[in-house]
Amino acid sequence: MTIEKDESTWATFKRLWPHISLYKAGLGVAVVALVINALSDTYMISLLKPLLDEGFGSADSDFLKKMPFIILAMMFIRGLSGFVSGYCMSWVASNVVMRIRRQIFNHFMHMPVSYFDQESTGRLLSRITYDSEQVAAATSKALVNIVRESASIIGLLGLMFWNSWQLSLVLVVIAPVVAFAISNVSKRFRKISKNMQTAMGSLTATSEQMLKGHKVVLSYGGQKVESERFDNISNHMRQQNMKMVVAQGLANPIIQMIASFALVTVLYLASVDSIKETLTPGTFTVVFSAMFGLLRPLKGLTSVTSDFQRGMAACQTLFELMDMDKEKDDGTIEKDTVKGDIKVDNVTFTYPTADGPALRNVSFDLPAGKTIALVGRSGSGKSTIANLFTRFYDVDSGEISLDGDKIEDYRLPNLRKHFALVSQNVHLFNDTVANNIAYASEGKFTRLEIEKAAELAYASDFINKMDDGFDTMIGENGASLSGGQRQRIAIARALLQNAPVLILDEATSALDTESEKAIQSALDELQKDKTVLVIAHRLSTIEDADQILVVDEGEVVERGNHAELIAHDGAYAQLHRIQFGD
């Protein structure tokens, strides 16, 4: 599960900064353009003083004649700087988000299976999509506004103090109050943003659950149940959005009200004789206009704080994910090939979320080139043993070795390349048939080898009938294929990999009897000179195994070949009678 911890905005931004600083050229250009944009506004206000004191106050002044050209030039500079800053910041933001998304995606692929057992897919998708978009908003729109409005405030303050430091001293009193208000608003925005992330994760998870289980929903008339579930979650999301709206709506007028006290005070002080004597109409107008002009950047800073805090909250969540431990891979052994001699010695294993062990003191030898079958009731621990071979999970105690070396001593990628897995839960990718059969081979196999593997898996007939044959896109998880067709492609994938150790976890469970017999012949050919672990419910498929282990409640309760177990008349013989009606 994701570890919740609260970091300060500054601490989170410091961690985000290395990602942003990689694109400092674009960032630097954007900052310069933003400062120019802000200073152009300040310069426009500063023109009021010569306009009033010289333009209208002097008969021979030609300042009025220059004003139209100055305004046109400033508008051009303002427009150009606005475009450059917007483009550069968007470029920086898109690259930062792409980089973070890639890191999250790659981190997900190296996280232990146990993590995904506890997290919903929808919530994880929300991290890659929604949360990263909030980071984009923080690094583009938010940073643009923060830099521009901050530069505007600094420029206007400088202009005010330059023209009348006496009137401008009012801000020394007002500034801490405004800073305190913005600080409190930021904390509120951060809290609401975290809640919105959680709500969005629930929304995505609920939607994904309904879409994946659409047939079940229709079959059981679950539309009302799912609709009510989604209504509740979407209403929670709406409530969080409204809380953000309320926070933003109250923050702006409160801060502007505080700033308005400064305006009122300036008007009052301007009437004091000692100060009034130092003011010209132009000076007073510039100071008052600059102070009034501060309201816009103050409002902008308050508004953008919500986007920035939302982005920082998303950053914190993403960084928490990136801080989570990857699969433990401390091994150093790498072998091009192995014999496939496997020993399981007194292994006990408990799933992270389970109360009791799934396996208890399991021991057996699987010599190279031999076949061992695991049989037993559902949930007895058969598939768990297969998962331990490839280190999808690590044992609590005991040891599993491959060719005399503990599997923990192998590097994970190297260990797994020695195993070919055909599971009852087939996963296919939204790609061509050929690419699914040769998945992750990176050009290692020729087209002829791919087609040969499909032929051995008795998949060629239905593949060749497709519109584009082996180049046909099969949709998400092979949605356009039947269960048997999907499983035959998975078998072809294992045939092509030709690994020394083969794990067949209910490999023919989705096939009809005729297809099963055909594929069994291919599997028999495939198993020659290989170490094979077969997990099966259909006892007819494992009668020729060198040894059969009967697993019950995580323990091996019987072992022997088919004839020996039938003669023993124990648990295996009972299963055999149930299936064959003997």
Swiss-Prot record:
Tagged with keyword tRNA-binding: no
Compartment list: Cell inner membrane
TM segment ranges? 16-36, 69-89, 153-173, 250-270, 275-295
The subunit field of the Swiss-Prot or TrEMBL record says: Homodimer.
The record's family statement is: Belongs to the ABC transporter superfamily. Lipid exporter (TC 3.A.1.106) family.
Q: Which PANTHER family match?
A: ATP-BINDING CASSETTE SUB-FAMILY B MEMBER 10, MITOCHONDRIAL, ATP-DEPENDENT PERMEASE MDL1, MITOCHONDRIAL
Please explain the role this protein plays, according to its UniProt record. Answer: Involved in lipopolysaccharide (LPS) biosynthesis. Translocates lipid A-core from the inner to the outer leaflet of the inner membrane. Transmembrane domains (TMD) form a pore in the inner membrane and the ATP-binding domain (NBD) is responsible for energy generation.
Gene Ontology MF terms: ABC-type oligopeptide transporter activity; ATP binding; ATP hydrolysis activity; ATPase-coupled lipid transmembrane transporter activity
Is Cell membrane a UniProt keyword of this protein?
yes
Which EC class is the enzyme in? translocase
| Protein name in UniProt | ATP-dependent lipid A-core flippase
